[in-house]
Amino acid sequence: MASSAPAWVPYEPTRDCSQGLCSMYCPQWCYFIFPPPPPFDVAGTSADDSSGPVFSPLVIAIIGVLASAFLLVSYYTFISKYCGTVSSLRGRVFGSSSGGAAYGGGAGSGGRHGHGQSRSHESWNVSPPSGLDETLINKITVCKYRRGDGFVHTTDCSVCLGEFSDGESLRLLPRCSHAFHQQCIDTWLKSHSNCPLCRANITFVTVGLASPEPEGCAPGETGGDNTHEVVVVMDGLENLCEEQQEAVSRASTADDDHDAKDVAEGMEEANGAAEIREEGSPPKRGASSFDLHRDNRMCIADVLQESMEDELTAARESGLLAGGAGTSRRCHGENSKGRGGRSRRALQLQDAMEALPGKRLPSGGRSCFSSKSGRGKDSDHPM
C-alpha cells in the first residue's frame, strides 16, 4: 500500500524563475490553488463606494438657498401680476358703471337709477384710464401765488417738488383745491384725470341755467313781434296786504305833514325788494340768457326813488294827499265790481301801490304781473 502512493518531487527552491523550471511549490504559482487575499482598506470603504461623486454640506446649503430665493421671486411675480390685473379690471368696470350713471342723464329707470347714484359717490376714487382734453384743462382755475395770503395752503408743488414763488401761475383743482404749477399739472392732466396728490377725479358738472319763470303767472297769448312783457317778482306777499292796508288808512286820515312822514316811515319799515325784468323775446336757456335777464333787471325802489320826494312835496302843497288816497281807493272800489274772480288781497295790493308808488315792497312770497305794450289799460294781474 505504501509503495503504491505517488512520490512527490522534492522541492528545491530556486531563486531564478525565469527558466520555467519552477515547481508547483513556487510562490509565483500559488494562485492556481488558492485565490489571493483581498487588499486591506484603511478608510473602511469598498472600491465601488469610493468611485461615486461626493457632495459637501456647503454645496447642499447653497443649492437650498438658491432654490428658496427662486421660489419666492416666482411667487411674488405671479401674485403681483395677477392682483394688478384684477384691480385694474375692477377699476375699469366700476369706473364705467359709475361714469355712465353720472353722465348718462337718466338713461336708467327704477332701481337702476338708485344703483348708479350710489356708485357715483365712489367714482371719484377710481382713476379713469385716459387724461383730460386741453379745453377742459384750460377751464381749471388759475391764480397768482402770494405768500401768506392764505388762499393756497401748500408752499410746494407735488409734481416737480419745487417751492412756489410769488407771482407764479398756479392751478387749483376743482374738487380737492390742491395747487400745482400750471405747466406741471397741465402735463400731468394730459395723461391722467385725477389729482396727483389725493387721486381724486377731476369732474366737471355742467349745470344748465334755466330761464327764471315766475310762479303763479298764467300763460298769456303773444300779440306779435312788438309784444313788450314786464314781469314783476315781489317778495313778501303774505304780510303785504296788512301793512299796505295800514299805510293806506294812515294816508286817508292824515291832515298835516307829520302824518305824511309817519306814512312814509311806516312804508319803509317793510324792508322788501321787488325786481322788474323786461323781456323783448322768449327767454333762452343758457348763460347768455341769464346775463340778459340780469342786465334788464332793476329794483322798483331805485326806479321810483327819484320821484318820491317830488310827489310828497306836490301832495303837501296841494293838500290832496289824504283825498287822493281816498279817491284812489274809491275808484278801485267801483272798478272792483266788474273784476270777477279777483281776490281781495290783489285789490288791496294794487290800491297800496297806486297810493304810494315810490315805496319798496316787503320780502317773502312771489307774484308776477304782465302787461302788453299794445293795450291802453292795465291788464289783469293774475296772482
Swiss-Prot record:
Q: Where are the transmembrane segments?
A: 53-73
Q: Which CDD domains match?
A: RING-H2_EL5-like
Q: Which domain of life is it from?
A: Eukaryota
> What's a BP term from Gene Ontology annotated to this protein?
protein ubiquitination
Q: Does the keyword Transmembrane helix apply?
A: yes
Q: Which parts of the sequence are RING-type zinc fingers?
A: 157-199
- List the catalytic activities from the record: S-ubiquitinyl-[E2 ubiquitin-conjugating enzyme]-L-cysteine + [acceptor protein]-L-lysine = [E2 ubiquitin-conjugating enzyme]-L-cysteine + N(6)-ubiquitinyl-[acceptor protein]-L-lysine
Q: Where in the cell is it found?
A: Membrane
Any one GO molecular-function label of the UniProt entry? zinc ion binding
Per the record's keyword annotation, is Metal-binding included, yes or no? Answer: yes
Q: Which keywords does this Swiss-Prot/TrEMBL entry list?
A: Membrane, Metal-binding, Transferase, Transmembrane, Transmembrane helix, Ubl conjugation pathway, Zinc, Zinc-finger
Pathway given in the UniProt record: Protein modification; protein ubiquitination
Q: Name the membrane topology term.
A: Single-pass membrane protein
What PROSITE patterns is this protein classified in? ZF_RING_2
Show the Gene3D superfamilies listed in the entry: Zinc/RING finger domain, C3HC4 (zinc finger)
Matching Pfam families, A to Z? zf-RING_2
A single GO CC term for this protein reads: membrane
InterPro entries of this UniProt entry? ATL1/ATL16-like, Znf_RING, Znf_RING/FYVE/PHD
Quick one: where's region Disordered?
A: 105-129, 269-291, 320-383
Q: What is its EC number?
A: 2.3.2.27
PANTHER family registered for this protein in UniProt: RING-H2 FINGER PROTEIN ATL16, RING-TYPE E3 UBIQUITIN TRANSFERASE
Q: What does this protein do?
A: Possesses E3 ubiquitin-protein ligase in vitro.
What is the protein name stated in its UniProt record?
Answer: E3 ubiquitin-protein ligase Os04g0590900
Which species is listed as the source?
Answer: Oryza sativa subsp. japonica
State the organism's lineage.
Answer: Eukaryota, Viridiplantae, Streptophyta, Embryophyta, Tracheophyta
